[in-house]
């Protein structure tokens, strides 16, 4: 039987560890066994138990304290991840060979790991050799995405990971439970966006014609190919969490031996998901 994996990615502070902790709790409520692997060698603490922790293999602090290497925080993290890539046998021993595994990999937040370093791509290829079906889960902080330019920046970060890893990817706006009522109304337009409408909002502040043309090209690419869409993730709302899990399960065909149901908001009905979520929370 196949094994299943989520690569939980996103900028620092986007809520990756919180996502892993709450998703494990949600799956336990559904009688599903889910394990977590920490792949951040700079992590200090997290609110979940792990089946494997990269800090048992190598830690950023140890690398930075090595007088022969003389690395800073970012250089130290890159060194740790490259060392990890050369020691995948450690991960294989930690994972074992249990069938029907479902594992969340809590990844570091540095974007260079996905843009111009081969480490994460090598990890995906290794997991696939171990018969894992892998889905990328790219998180962005909803509090960061309430302005058009920041939203476009978040889309480009998600797109860079998607192109680099070449795996199914679900993009998620986290911390929806922390937004005010006004902010929730503002962010609704970013969940299933009309990029040309956002373009009109953005370019009025641009003084350079070159930047206007670039922004127009980026928005056109995103809108014409429907390459990036976001799902809301509210850790206080079980339905919101279940919708995200359904989309991930569909991407990797989890439970295909069972009678499988597509996410009820899939494709043409996707807008109803956002309407339902915000209707439920409009009076908060």
Curated annotation (Swiss-Prot):
Record's keyword terms, sorted: GTP-binding, Hydrolase, Nucleotide-binding
Binding site for GTP: 13-18, 174-177
GO molecular function term, any single one: GTPase activity
Domain of life: Eukaryota
Residue numbers covered by motif Gly-Pro-Asn (GPN)-loop: 72-74
InterPro entries linked to this entry: Gpn, Gpn3, P-loop_NTPase
Pfam families with a match to the protein in the record: ATP_bind_1
Gene3D superfamilies recorded: P-loop containing nucleotide triphosphate hydrolases (3.40.50.300)
Site residues by UniProt (Stabilizes the phosphate intermediate): 74
SUPFAM superfamilies found in the cross-reference section: P-loop containing nucleoside triphosphate hydrolases
PANTHER family per record: GPN-LOOP GTPASE 3, XPA-BINDING PROTEIN 1-RELATED
Function (record text): Small GTPase required for proper localization of RNA polymerase II (RNAPII). May act at an RNAP assembly step prior to nuclear import.
Subunit structure, interactors included: Heterodimer with GPN1. Binds to RNA polymerase II (RNAPII). Interacts directly with subunits RPB4 and RPB7 and the CTD of RPB1.
Family as reported in the entry's similarity comment: Belongs to the GPN-loop GTPase family.
Listed name of the protein: GPN-loop GTPase 3
Gene: GPN3
